[in-house]
Design a protein with these regions (language model features):
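Non-catalytic interaction/targeting regions
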Residues: 1-258
Length: 258
């Protein structure tokens, strides 16, 4: 059963918004436990007056209710989104799982970069821009850093894993250039700390046929500097996704597929 409600009008979202307020699932078997009921709460709705567009809610709370205890809250997940502007709308910046008392158990933090895009033919250049605000510019807002934390009810969380992304910003199209991963909590949001492994990617394109971003080399390097895995590919770029050869590292040798 779905239920809907209308949010209260605010300065950020005049007129409010019709939203799903609850979801009840009845599996038809009534002697094996209670019905599953989930309630939803929405905060910080934003309408861009300049663009005349709804940018979303800044916070969405999903509440798991105990139907055997008069729908008492026993767990909730909180998702926070960037609704500060047209270019960043919908970017998830924080997600957490909390108990009924508000103690955090897990948390995910995301950080993004903002770029203005200029094109010369089919070659793009991305220029870093801390604040994206323009009537005409094209923008690129990729995910740079993700950290996962475990709290288990404690006041301070412990980083259990981190990921950092780097992108091609000149002469390409914003493809992923490098990905770093760490489960030691020492990588950092700038990606300049210790990591477990790094994946580097190279691409080829045929702009005359609008065939772009075909990966030609994927190399996985450990934090110790050793190459642990490598795959290369060759394409007939006259046709989209026409793969002609794959070479994979296999021990001290190679495995080639034509």
């Amino acid at each position: 059963t779905l239920d809907y409600a209308h949010t209260a009008p605010t300065y950020g979202l005049p007129g409010g918004k019709w939203v799903m307020s609850s979801l009840m699932v009845d599996d038809g078997i009534h002697d094996d436990g209670p019905l599953m009921t989930t309630a939803f709460e929405y905060k910080d709705g934003k309408r861009d007056r300049h663009e005349r567009e709804f940018l979303g809610f800044g916070e969405v709370i999903t509440k798991n209710l105990d139907t055997e205890k008069e729908n008492a809250l026993y767990r909730k997940s909180v998702q926070k989104y960037d609704v500060s502007g047209y270019y960043t709308q919908g970017n998830l910046v924080n997600a957490s799982v909390e108990d009924a008392a508000g103690k955090v158990y897990t948390e995910t933090r995301n950080e993004y970069d903002g770029y203005y895009l200029t094109a010369k033919g089919d070659e793009y250049t991305f220029t870093a821009q801390p604040v994206l605000c323009s009537d005409r510019a094209s923008a690129f807002v990729p995910l740079r850093y993700t950290a996962n934390l475990q709290y288990e009810g404690a006041a301070q969380g412990m980083i259990t894993s981190e990921a950092w992304n780097e992108y091609y910003l000149t002469g390409h199209h914003g493809e992923l250039k490098s990905y770093k991963f760490s489960n030691k909590g020492k990588l950092g949001s700038k990606g300049d700390g210790k990591f477990d492994y790094q994946t580097s990617i190279r691409y080829t394109s045929n702009s005359s046929r609008n065939i772009l971003g075909l990966p030609t080399d994927v190399t996985v390097t450990g934090g110790d500097g050793k190459v642990y895995h490598q795959v290369s590919a060759v394409y007939d770029t006259k046709y989209p996704n026409h793969l002609t050869k794959i070479t994979q590292q296999l021990g001290n040798g190679e495995a080639v597929t034509d």
